[in-house]
Structures are given as C-alpha cells and as structure tokens.
C-alpha cells in the first residue's frame, strides 16, 4: 500500500510526537540547567574538567548514534526489514560495551585521574548513542513510551546528579560514573524490550548493505560536530573569553532549531521510507529538488546580503541575529530534502555524504577568515555559506538526474 505524505497526520501521530518531544525537551532542559548549576557548585576549575571531558567525547555520540539510528529508521520499516533489528542493536551496543570495561580499568587504577575521567566521558557518549538507537528501535515496534521513558529517566538522572553534588560534594569523575551507570541499566531495559519480540532470521547478505548505510548516514552528523569543533578552535585562538561566550549562546540557540527539526524528521522517517518504497525513488528525488530549488538561491542571496553587511562594518546583535535566522531557515529547508535523498539508495546516501563533507570544508575555510574578522557574526555567516554549498551540490546533482 502506498503511503501518502500529503495526508493530514492522524491525531495519534500528533499526540505521540508531542510526547516524544516532551521527553527529549525535558532531557535537554535538564542537561543545560544542570551544567549551569554545576558551574556554580564546583567553580570554574572543576567544571572545566567535566565540560572538557564531555566536549572532547562529543563526536562519539554522533558516531555511535546518528548513522545507525537513521539506517535503522530507513531499512527496518521496509519489507523484511525487521530481520535487521538485531544487527542494529549490536552496532549500537558494541561501542558502549567496549568503552565501559576500559573506563572501569582506568578508574580502578586511578579513580580521580584524567584518564579515568576522559574514559568515563567517552563511555557516557557511547551510552547516549546506544540509548538513541535502542529508543528508535522501540519506536519502530510501536513502543513510543519507551523513548519517552528513556529520556525522562535521563532528565531525572541529570537533576539527581546535581542534587548529589550539592549534598555530598562529589566531583566530576564520580558524576560521570553515575551517568554511565544509569545508562548501563537504561540500555539494558530498552534492549530487553526488543529481545522479547522475534525479529526473524535475516539473510546475511543484507548485513553488509545495512552497515554501509549506517556508515554513510553518519557522515553528516560527524562533519557537523567537526565543523562546530573547528569553529570553537578558531575562537580559542582569538583568546577572547567574551566573544567565545557570546558565540556559545548563539550556537545553543541554533542547536535548539537544528535538533528540533532533526528529531521531527527522525519521527517521520519510517513513514517516509515506506512511502519511497511504495512510490519509487524517483518521486523522492523530485520532491527533494522541489524543496531545494527555491531554498538554495534564497540562501545564496542571504549570504551575499550578510556579506555586504559585514563589509559595511556591521557585526552587532542585529546582524548576528539575522545570520542566525538565515542559518536556521536554511537548515530547516535542507534537512528534509536530504532526508528524502538519504532514504532512496546508497547512491543517494553517498551524495549526501559528499555534500556534507564539502559543507565542512567551506565552514572550516570561511571560518578561518570570518571568525577573527567578525566573531559570532562571522561564524554564523560561515555556517550559512556551508549550508548553501551543501544544498547547492545536492540540487545540481538532482537536476542532472531528474531532467
């Protein structure tokens, strides 16, 4: 049966989506609030140890969750795809299962040392990645409540951790250990809910394409994290704490939009995958082209206008806010188009990966000049330029394919 994407969403889908956003929103709010409170409780020195360990390990979250989750959401809903569920569970659990013993060994040797702290942060990132995939697989089985439960549990863990720090004076290593322990139990519970149902026996020949899909689909998230890391490195080179702090605030605001759109697309992705299976890949590519056709020229115009503003010496809050709005609008347009192409075949996924790599190259190159020149405004302008190139490469290729 062909699934139409133009139908009005059923009330149950709207209610489930609202509940899922509430769970994720509670976790994000708890995480950001906890960091602010921890800074006050610990002071800058101890908090820097905690924040740096988490920051360095952030790429592991993207590596262990995004590609695997997106591949599962693209392949499992299709005919015969349920047999791939154990493979995606294994791909999600393996990094966490490796990271935890390494952390335990280092913690046993030196509980308060830097190696144990970084290993705990790495295990925490892998655990969060595993949780995201397990929650997605539960959603695919119609168990959306498991996703909500998981992220509400993580929100409670953040609040409880802050409470323990206030009551006991526990330090960064101990708090990271607490979060790793919570994730170990939570992931086991999520996995148990998946193991109870029979997935059937998969054709081993389908494993390699599934792993390849997961690898290709991880590129966009990993390059996005890398672009953010490189941009912050440019700010570190400026050695201006105020400018770095201002950019951090703007980047948090942007991340709210990006994560919100990304998560909404993850919720809708199984329906998109089934729709593409029913209507054909050509229809998905045509729809992606129709989305990008106005978005890319509008984005290019925005970059030119913002460049003129920069050349005129304007780089204050109004200019930075305009750049933020332009980047948010571009992202909101480009992500759905890429979702359509990524859910077609390996050729589409390779194209999306190449476009993401080019986006990273543009952000890194433009940021090298723009961050010293205009700080937060320059960084957001570099982001806009990267988004235009990413969408432009995709649009140019789709025009060749669909003309």
Model segments located where?
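Membrane-interface junctions at transmembrane-helix termini in multi-pass inner-membrane proteins
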Residues: 127-149, 329-355
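Hydrophobic alpha-helical transmembrane segments
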Residues: 118-127, 148-199, 322, 358-362, ...
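Membrane-water interface segments that mark the loop-to-transmembrane alpha-helix transition
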Residues: 15-28, 53-108, 112, 277-303, ...
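Interfacial segments at transmembrane-helix termini and the short loops linking adjacent helices
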Residues: 44-45, 106-124, 241, 305-335, ...
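Helix-loop junctions and terminal segments of transmembrane helices
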Residues: 58, 62-80, 250, 254-279, ...
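Residue-level recognition of transmembrane alpha-helices
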Residues: 20, 24, 51-54, 91-92, ...
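N-terminal membrane topogenesis motif
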Residues: 1-30, 193-195, 201-217, 393-403
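Signature of the first transmembrane helix
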Residues: 3, 10-66, 215-242, 252-253, ...
């Amino acid at each position: 049966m062909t699934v139409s994407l133009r139908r009005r969403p059923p009330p149950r889908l709207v209610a489930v989506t609202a509940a899922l956003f509430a769970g994720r929103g509670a976790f994000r709010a708890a995480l950001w609030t906890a960091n602010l409170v921890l800074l006050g409780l610990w002071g800058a020195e101890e908090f820097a140890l905690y924040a740096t360990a988490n920051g360095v390990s952030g790429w592991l979250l993207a590596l262990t969750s995004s590609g695997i989750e997106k591949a599962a959401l693209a392949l499992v809903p299709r005919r015969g795809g349920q047999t791939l569920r154990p493979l995606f569970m294994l791909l999600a659990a393996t990094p966490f299962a490796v990271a935890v013993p390494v952390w335990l060994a280092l913690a046993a040797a030196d509980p308060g040392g830097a190696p144990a702290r970084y290993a705990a942060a790495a295990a925490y990132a892998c655990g969060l990645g595993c949780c995201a995939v397990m929650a997605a697989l539960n959603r695919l089985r119609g168990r959306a409540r498991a996703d909500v439960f998981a992220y509400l549990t993580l929100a409670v863990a953040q609040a409880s951790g802050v409470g323990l720090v206030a009551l006991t004076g526990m330090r960064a290593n101990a708090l990271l250990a607490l979060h790793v322990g919570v994730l170990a139990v939570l992931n086991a519970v999520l996995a148990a809910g998946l193991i109870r149902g029979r997935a059937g026996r998969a054709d081993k020949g389908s494993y390699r394409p599934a792993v390849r899909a997961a690898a290709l689909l991880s590129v966009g998230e990993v390059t996005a994290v890398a672009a953010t890391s490189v941009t912050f490195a440019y700010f570190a080179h400026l050695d201006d704490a105020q400018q770095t702090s201002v950019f951090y605030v703007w980047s948090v605001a942007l991340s709210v939009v990006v994560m919100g759109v990304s998560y909404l697309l993850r919720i809708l992705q199984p329906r998109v995958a089934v729709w593409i299976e029913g209507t054909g890949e050509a229809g998905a590519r045509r729809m992606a082209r129709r989305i990008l056709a106005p978005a890319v020229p509008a984005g290019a115009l925005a970059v030119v206008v913002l460049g003129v503003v920069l050349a005129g010496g304007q780089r204050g809050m109004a200019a930075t806010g305009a750049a933020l709005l332009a980047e948010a609008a571009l992202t909101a347009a480009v992500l759905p188009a890429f979702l359509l192409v990524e859910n077609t075949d390996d050729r589409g996924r390779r194209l999306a990966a190449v476009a993401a790599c080019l986006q990273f190259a543009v952000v890194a190159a433009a940021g090298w000049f723009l961050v010293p020149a205009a700080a937060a405004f320059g960084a957001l302008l570099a982001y806009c330029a990267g988004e235009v190139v990413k969408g432009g490469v995709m649009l140019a290729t789709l025009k060749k394919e669909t003309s």
